[in-house]
Amino acid sequence: MSAKAVSELSGKEVLYKYFEPSGLLSAPHAFHVKAGENFDEIANKYEWLARDNKGVIKPDQLIKRRGKLGLVKIGTPQELKAWFEKTGDSYVRVGQTEGRLHTFIVEPFCAHTEKDEMYIAIYSERFRDVIMFYEQGGVDIGDVEEKARTVSVPVQLNENAMTPSDEELTTLLGPLKDSDIVRRFVVELYKAYKDLHFTYLEINPFVLLNNQIHVLDLAARLDETANFLCADKWKSRLTPYGGPNHVEFPAPFGRDLTSEEQYISEMDAKTGASLKLTILNRKGRVWTMVAGGGASVVFTDTVCDLGGASELANYGEYSGDPSESQTYEYAKTLLSVMTEGTPRPDGKVLIIGGSIANFTNVAKTFGGIVRAFETFVSKLKEHKVTIFVRRGGPNYQEGLRRIKDAATKLELPIHVFGPETHMTAIVGAALGVKPMPTVPTAPQTTGQFLLSPERNTGGTERAPPSPAANATPTEHPLTTAQQNKLKSFRGLFEDDTKAIIWGQQAKAIQGMLDFDYVCRRSSPSVVASTYPFTGDNKQKYYFGQKEILIPAYKSMAKAFATHPDASIMVTFASMRSVFETVLEALEFPQIKVIAIIAEGVPENQTRKLLKIAHDRGVTLVGPATVGGIKPGCFKIGNTGGMMDNILASKLYRPGSVAYVSRSGGMSNELNNIISQNTNGVYEGIAIGGDRYPGSTYTDHVIRYQNDDRVKMIVLLGEVGGVEEYKIVDLLKQKKVTKPLVAWCIGTCADHITSEVQFGHAGASANALGETAACKNAALRASGALVPESFDDLGNKIRQTYDELVSQQIIVPQPEVPPPAVPMDYAWARELGLIRKPASFMTSICDERGEELNYAGVPITKVLESDMGIGGVLGLLWFQKRLPPHANKFIEICLMLTADHGPAVSGAHNTIVCARAGKDLISSLTSGLLTIGDRFGGALDGAARQFSEAFDQGWSANQFVSEMRKKGKHIMGIGHRVKSINNPDKRVEILKRFAMDKKEFAQETPLFEYALEVEKITTAKKPNLILNVDGAIAILFVDILRHSGMFTKQEAEETIEIGSLNGLFVLGRSIGFIGHYLDQSRLKQGLYRHPWDDISYIMPESNLVKF
């Protein structure tokens, strides 16, 4: 939802902060007190209340007409406290809604008379803002719409030009026209309204006292999508009293947010997906979990239309391609509420529904739902929950298979249906008022791209199949003569339409090209893409089996200049950048259509784009849309879903029925219903779910009326707004004469007493005429063909089509099979349709899921267990969860080997390379390349020699003797500087750690054996001590053999593949990097070795022959 009501305190604070520099507003420090809180403790922080001044207290919970309801108290601090303690936590009824009073605003009382009270309101419409003013305000103002004077301010790109003129202000203020302060206040208030992205602001009353305006009562809505623009402006003033520093958007009165609703709301705020949950009746029998904004409304409508309103437990949706874990959390939260309390004797039903998805991977989301079933399986059985599932879209077969497998494995009663079944057919079965739907024959895999049209989702008997195609393709659905006659009429999209795509959207572009190919277009519809964050390049795509290159441009201007025949731009820009992107695109006169996919575009920005596009004759589709499709010609982005759905819905060739809808998911459902009950879709547009879509129902219905290729129109409206009434007027005026089948979703709103925001930003009725029921009645009365419910929509479309066929207005043509479209390799692999040997294998790390895994351990568990870097190394190097003493040993080794001064070869090389001006990686690798048998590479050798001697049963004396006989140096023994008299502190640390059996809790036989060897070698020469390489290597072998974590074979393999040397390389890399950074800080110049430190030994001249 974009326009959200704010608390009175938040609304006032936002205005007080904005007006602070001007001093025009009196800005007292009001505060909230909530039921159960200590009134005195909070009130004592506010000096104005501590002085026994009068104050005002009233609920701040979006309640209208509080004065008339007796919910305003004026009095001393003690009187306010007494009223608060009496009223807090009490229940009151406002209209049809009963709710608890829990949050109150307390502010200073402004003494005045009724004649001082004035009224002002500002609200936004599609192409204008309206300012209403009346010099008499307060609770008894009466019908303000009749009394108030108004000024309209047209939307313009330049906001500074959007201000009422002096003449308009004079007319607006009436008897107060000479009041300079009131005049300034109106001008500044409207400026604040625009800058702060209000969508509605009403102050009733405000008074003028002592040359300042006092705002006594306020109601407002802010455009929540403008948060990225206004986050700082929406913060309250800095005060010594504390209080919230952010805007509060309270739940509607009568609907306190439950902990579950709050949790889902917080999840929704952190993801690009849409997650909504409203609990209507915790003890209800009928629960829904529906994918898609429009579909969620349709399912709720159907429950209510079939008599289940009193049992409806919740409203909600999950859409926008949520991840498996997000779907799991959503489902788990829903099931936790559904299965709480005492089980009902008649059990409960859970309806998991949705329209046919455009791009959401159904199997992925259903994986999360199955996990939730597994978590709550005992509770689901205890509460006798019966589950009904209906879904379609990408990979839906795999998703439905997972649900069926879960039903068998968990022994749960789950009835599963795909897009072969009408979307809401499962609702009647779930409520027990209709028989269980039959399951028609359906394709079994998404891989069957040339699908036989056996799918019937229209809720009607199947239409007889079209005659078999002749060898010679027949024009469809018009004859050649008819087509020639209509060549002069061009719609938004034709079979030669070309588009430029804004954004890095390879998948969407490939989908458009596949659609072009299956429609038998002679050339691709996408001629270029543009994205300002990459350089000019060419990107590879497929047009059928053929590889093609499509240019990508950094500059949009260059893209359109290079491709003057491109008339459409599809922009995938985010809500933050879409305004500037579309504004730039509108500068190019060749553009006729711009499709805006992004959700969350601020309404003020959208309205400016609408204004400019309208003035320049450009059609906008969106924002918040999947786009549109014209079978046989063109599709926008991901419209129509996967290729299997496009083929099943016969979207590869034109039909005779055009439709317009708000919802992208529901447009896919309409594609199915129309294709199974008529000769197919001619064109379909999803205008988007925002309050101000770029183009309207009326725009497209008029286009369809004027296009003789369209024989029948379908309109899917919804609750909220008045756009459908324009269609009513067109019908009455006979400006639309073609058969119009219409249905407005959202009839459930009449059955829900508390305010609920449905799937789309514009789906909320603010007046009786905006309800779906009123719209449906008006459409029916004006001559539209309106079904009894959405369940009956397919029947109504079929009946209308049959009449047109009988009148020969539509003449069905033979079907021509589409060309085979190759399936994308990545998608085919995901579906399990193909396999090939992997080029790489890994067993230590997996980043593909929701969370990084180290050897199967989620990264969150790694951090929570506090295993340290030693534990991480154990997972990544050995695929083991090592014991604590082993983790600590690894960390000690890394610290001990981190550096040994600049004189050693590795550090020296790193320093020389750094001083030559090389980068970090080059300098580091130059140092690492010196590591070998002579420098740092003794760990593996020491481990191997000592292990072999110990395993053969040699004594320490025998081992030393055997090595001397072979003339081999004992790896890990000896040091150039250190000796028995000047021991290596690093080795001493390791010895103490290994001998402390409380900390190093395991046997160390090899290390003890090495100490015996050291006694023998140091007796011969003091510097033949066990060095740090040897100590590390031998102790590590003990860990491998005696920690209980490794088999003998694993221990030997670990030594053999060089793991021990890895410890030295990893540790010493720390020091090498330190040397590089040190040299860079010191800014040392190029190193050149001095001549006097080099012995030049040249051959005698008489020995060199030329």
UniProtKB/Swiss-Prot annotation:
Entry GO MF terms: ATP binding; ATP citrate synthase activity; metal ion binding
EC number(s) from the headed UniProt entry: 2.3.3.8
Lineage: superkingdom: Eukaryota
Enzyme class, UniProt record, top EC level: transferase
Keywords (A to Z) from UniProt: ATP-binding, Cytoplasm, Lipid biosynthesis, Lipid metabolism, Magnesium, Metal-binding, Nucleotide-binding, Phosphoprotein, Transferase
Composition skew (Polar residues), residue ranges: 442-459
Subcellular location: Cytoplasm
Sites where the protein binds Mg(2+): E718
Active site: H760 (tele-phosphohistidine intermediate)
Residue ranges of the TM segments: none
Substrates-to-products reaction catalysed: oxaloacetate + acetyl-CoA + ADP + phosphate = citrate + ATP + CoA
Positions of citrate binding: N358, T360, R391
Main location: cytoplasm
A single GO BP: acetyl-CoA biosynthetic process
Binding residue positions for ATP: 701-721, 752-778
Sequence positions that bind CoA: L779, R780, A781, S782, G783, A784, L785, V786, P787, E788, S789
GO cellular component: cytosol
Short name of any one Pfam family annotated for the protein: CoA_binding
Residue segments, region Disordered: 442-478
Keyword set includes Nucleotide-binding: yes
Function: Catalyzes the cleavage of citrate into oxaloacetate and acetyl-CoA, the latter serving as common substrate in multiple biochemical reactions in protein, carbohydrate and lipid metabolism.
Quaternary structure and interacting proteins, as annotated: Homotetramer.
Protein family: In the N-terminal section; belongs to the succinate/malate CoA ligase beta subunit family. In the C-terminal section; belongs to the succinate/malate CoA ligase alpha subunit family.
Protein's name according to its UniProt entry: Probable ATP-citrate synthase
Gene name linked to the record: acly-1
